[in-house]
Amino acid sequence: MNSIALITTLAVGALAAPTGLRTELIEDTRTVYSAGQPTSANLNDVIVAWQRGSSGLLQVATVDTPTPSFSWRLPGEVSRQSAYRILVASAPELLREGSADVWDSGDVSDTTVSGIRLPDGLLSPATVYYWTVKVAGSDGNFTPYAPSNSFLTADEWTGGFSRSPLQKTVQTARPVSVNADGNMFADFGKAAFGQLSLDVTAAGHDTLTVHLGEAASGNSVNRDPGATVRYTSYRLPVHPGADTYTLTIRPDGRNAQIKPHGRDVRPVLMPDYVGEVYPFRYCEIETGSSEVTAIRRPVVHYRWNEDASSFTSSDSVLNAVWNLCKYSIFATSFAGVYVDGDRERIPYEADALINQLSHYCVDDEYTIARYTTHYLMDNATWPTEWILQAVLLAWNDYLYTGDAALLKADYETLKARTLTDLTEENGLISTRTGRQTPDLLRRCGYYGDRIRDIVDWPQSGALGVGKEEPGEADGYDLGDYNTVVNAYHYRALQLMEKIAGVLEKDADAAFFASRAASVRAAVNSYMLDKKRGCYRDGIGSSHYSLHASMFPMAFGMVPEKYRSSVLDHIRSRGMACSVYGSQFLLDALYDGGLDNHALGLLTSRGKRSWWNMIENGSTVTWEGWDPQFKPNLDWNHAWGAAPANIIIRKLMGVEPVEPGWKRMTIHPRPGNLESASAVVPTILGAVEVAFLNTADAFEMNVTIPSGTVADVTVPAPSRSSSLYVNGGKWQANPLRTDGNSSHPAAFTLQLTPGSYTLSAR
């Protein structure tokens, strides 16, 4: 591959220091909160509160391990690190070479900038520590030390993964109007999980009625929104004079109590320091004889950087879909762990997988995904495919952070989650042939009686628009050996080979590689109908669902000879899957070169679309496409937010190739989209990509952060195009692309950190 590097000449002493110091992947380990609000307290004040028995008074992101990881970002002048030196001390004035009383790593020759572990035995619980780092570039010259960061170790180490405290952002309702009933009506603009605070002036004792809801009917809160769309009301007594009143949100009997719940899983409870929350956008108040002078909503959410990402394009629907899905990741972070919506508030692997990828693409935040993944290792849910998805979650964590701590901590559980114990003589796995055992289920972290294949959800129900089959599984014919389950099994084995390799477990890596090859061969032998050119639902089935072909395509199982026919079948089924299934459908379409078809699904205005959610007044993604297809759907489900990651990973084409983004791809798949630009967060810094797509040329601007190299693909309008880099002609004769692609050719080159203008014309 051709490689281009930007060469910068620097004066001696011009190097800047590293930035963005993270401890356990958390950048802000200093801010102390109380009840979700930042305070002026410092880390030592937290220790004092602990000593006084007031551990619930102050919150901070504590380090819950004696061997925390350190990460940083390189200054722009250092395109690639050749060495680092870390200092850790018990006081900031000791952060000097020769004085650091906890640890001095010495000069370490290493390109790694994330996941550097402190040796064991050096830290104590309930103690404040300070650290800094300097790095050397390829010339061996070191930068100055970075401004120090500090962290507080937990009072008792559990060996878990650290996360940030939940925060509250107080919003004031605007506009506020009076409706035909004489009630005050307030619109906060977007739905959020929050509480309510009112400033009220009353002439005497009075009682206000407060209505909260996600949906409106004109300028009133919709009291009967249907499905599981939220509506509630409260009676609020007030006393004479002016005062501020805060509603105490009632706990829900289903999502706010620890008890066995349906399939042996439990809801996540809100911590006492923030209190119970309710999802709503609108507030309507029957004021009686009192005057309400201010309506505020404290919104509860996880740490969030709105400016970490952006996307805009020439298509207004696509822009609206992106904004919907990005905001959904923020709004649904209220529990500090990924949950499946307000109805249950339970972590599920499938929800977490889409939430994880989408969160990575909209914010440089990694700890809520890591915490959720680790939580699920011992809180597995019932679907077979969800059990297998844990391996995908764990690999994504390593791929996006470069920190292998989760892989090490959960390796044995991940091995069990490949479900190799269910392998039959034909090389495939089955949950229906008597191989499930209590021991296997416990090793998978599942405490129910058995796991069951799901394919998609709901499996049956109302007839779909534009498809013949009921439910969201496209009429899937479930049997003993199912194509979707074994496609997931293959993907889990494939990734476990990589995980074992990272952890230097060579025998395991060889085993998983061999099993993956066997499963791929078995699926293509038993499930691929070579006459029809697509996959049947399982052994003995005569049904050919969308899912049976889209998962093998998304997971790279389809033989080259059958790619075109499999893609034809996938295209023919439209959006015959749920909002969850759309993640893998769009992955398959983009990876197969069907970028125009994928763009059409993303920008569809039909009932099975994200636009349908927007058009019906929602600002957070739904659990399903429409109540017609899932009658009990809710309006606060992040598993409906796949476009947040699809637009970045596939349409803009920005993905990590090597762990910690040491190498990435930038491969736009524009279809007929005229223009787009995006800022993509990574642990190394922002990637910026913009393109202009015309019949005669494809213009592209990219900015690549330090610490990585990018394999860049530039679509070309014709086979006779030439590539220009920063104004100079670089190459002619582009490579032919997949016959399904909107562009007949493309150029590939490797770029080092810097900013580039690329033009294929």
Predicted regions and their residues:
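Well-ordered alpha-helical scaffold segments within catalytic/enzyme domains
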Residues: 288, 354-363, 390-406, 488-506, ...
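C-terminal capping/lid segments that line or modulate ligand- or cofactor-binding pockets
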Residues: 390, 429, 447-461, 471, ...
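Non-catalytic C-terminal accessory modules of carbohydrate-active enzymes
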Residues: 25, 513-514, 518-521, 596-761
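Fungal secretory targeting signals
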Residues: 1-16
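Acidic, mature catalytic/reactive cores of soluble proteins
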Residues: 214-219, 268, 291-294, 299-304, ...
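Short strand-turn-strand beta-turns centered on an Asx-Gly dipeptide
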Residues: 213, 403, 725-727
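Extracellular/oxidizing-compartment recognition motifs
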Residues: 17-335, 351, 365-368, 405
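Active-site acid/base region of carbohydrate-active enzymes
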Residues: 292-367, 371, 381, 385-388, ...
